[in-house]
Amino acid sequence: MVASSQKILVTGGAGFIGTHTVVQLLNNGFNVSIIDNFDNSVMEAVERVREVVGSNLSQNLEFTLGDLRNKDDLEKLFSKSKFDAVIHFAGLKAVGESVENPRRYFDNNLVGTINLYEVMAKHNCKKMVFSSSATVYGQPEKIPCVEDFKLQAMNPYGRTKLFLEEIARDIQKAEPEWRIVLLRYFNPVGAHESGKLGEDPRGIPNNLMPYIQQVAVGRLPELNVYGHDYPTRDGSAIRDYIHVMDLADGHIAALRKLFTSENIGCTAYNLGTGRGSSVLEMVAAFEKASGKKIALKLCPRRPGDATEVYASTAKAEKELGWKAKYGVEEMCRDQWNWAKNNPWGYSGKP
């Protein structure tokens, strides 16, 4: 535990990665204020964070219901509290939905973030950890993905992340006192070991592990495997899956870097394990962890899906002193622990 009186604003802190990061911030002695509009999350998630950290630490957590697109919500928050840094998670993140409704994504992800920068600058809070994504690499020409690769998003969601990275670089270049870390996540999975926090998507899940989990608890009949003829070891696509608690610790490491490195500028880091697992390998690992058989439906490839993507983690290891600790076995164990305790997510009912 590191004592700290620093206060961190966490936008979208009621979401999957947000809640797990807030737990680690509180455990590391930070004071935390969450702002969230519950577009893709619920108040119960915030209550569970309080439960997980205990009554003492939960005194250091505040919550505000607000929307970054409404500048007044931010203005009230920054007028009331002095923030030392912002961790910015808030945003929509479903690739398919972004293709069908790009305007919603541009409004939510871009407008909200631009408002946030303006209010931060006005109140002289110029340190940010930004939640980016490996989607900014698009179809990488080679692997592993290294931070200085050419960036080329393939869909509106990915483009919002890419635009926001470019905006961050432009702001920092024009106003060098800003310190910004861009964290490019690969595929976050798993859950808090308590089984009280986890991913709870609305509707049909867009990501592999919540989908597998819903088949395991009987909410969905089978898993659609998109592509079984890729040139990989078992024909299914390969991705870099990372435990959400490793990801949360990556944010703590990034925050420490912001506070200690005057010359950080605007720097990007990959957060992954540096190892790829195929869809079918993840299914097998989950079956082993849960004792459940996952019914599969083999489907054609989805347009735009890459064959194999995984991270080079050398830069984060060297500059942030961070390295993923958990393997696929722990990811599936914790995912199943969350699923069996919360088959219907935070609502507890169909």
Swiss-Prot record:
Optimum temperature is 30 degrees Celsius. Keywords: Carbohydrate metabolism, Cell wall biogenesis/degradation, Galactose metabolism, Isomerase, NAD. This is Bifunctional UDP-glucose 4-epimerase and UDP-xylose 4-epimerase 1. Its EC number is 5.1.3.2, 5.1.3.5. Transmembrane segments: none annotated. GO terms for biological process: capsule polysaccharide biosynthetic process; cell wall organization; galactose metabolic process; UDP-L-arabinose biosynthetic process. Pathway: Carbohydrate metabolism; galactose metabolism; Nucleotide-sugar biosynthesis; UDP-L-arabinose biosynthesis; UDP-L-arabinose from UDP-alpha-D-xylose: step 1/1; Cell wall biogenesis; cell wall polysaccharide biosynthesis. PANTHER family: BIFUNCTIONAL UDP-GLUCOSE 4-EPIMERASE AND UDP-XYLOSE 4-EPIMERASE 1, UDP-GLUCOSE 4-EPIMERASE. The active site is at residue 157. GO terms for molecular function: UDP-arabinose 4-epimerase activity; UDP-glucose 4-epimerase activity. NAD(+) binds at residues 15-17, 36-40, 67-68, 89, 93, 161, 185. The keyword Isomerase applies. Its cofactor is NAD(+). Substrate binds at residue 133. GO terms for cellular component: cytosol. It catalyses: UDP-alpha-D-glucose = UDP-alpha-D-galactose; UDP-beta-L-arabinopyranose = UDP-alpha-D-xylose. Belongs to the NAD(P)-dependent epimerase/dehydratase family. Inhibited by Hg(2+). Catalyzes the interconversion between UDP-glucose and UDP-galactose and the interconversion between UDP-arabinose and UDP-xylose. Optimum pH is 8.5-9.0. It is an enzyme of class 5 (isomerase).
